[in-house]
Amino acid sequence: KIKRQEELTIYFYNAAIKNGWFDEKDSEAALLVKKDLRPLEDIIDTMNIHAWLQECIHDAEGRYAKLITKLTVTVPMIELEKIAFEFGKLHTVGKVSVQDAYKFFDDIFLNGMPCDRVNIITQQDNSCFSWEQTHDIHAEYWLAFQGYPETYYKLRKQVMLGMLDGSGLILESPDY
């Protein structure tokens, strides 16, 4: 999940460079992208796994929030939503059950530590799968950079829609 979060941050950064929203010489923006994407098992602190993972999550969430908040100053939200959708299409779920689609979502989105129990399944059958978020684990990162937590959810929804593209499945979620 951390790796996917880093991929999403890089995807937005590269799109910003390509579209001229950031200059490649903008060192502040470049610092928001983690270049070292080695497998976690190669860099994990096995003596303190829980704290190490929490720090990685905090770092990844914070850099993503700061990058997107920086972009929202000059880039229309519709453009950022298009980028999020395209990122989702890179990770399409294909023709899967609703349960498998949820698993794909759960595998790609960083929602804190497993012990945070952010998503609770509320219904599952062959035609419908629903869950509720028990608390907003992302808002603190966005607020820290004077961003709007709703931005995270708007972009996440577009990633999810991109992931479902061509699957025949429909995502119903609140508009933020």
Predicted regions and their residues:
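Short beta-strand
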Residues: 120-123, 172-176
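Short, hydrophobic/π-rich interface segment
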Residues: 127-174
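N-terminal accessory segment detector
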Residues: 1-124
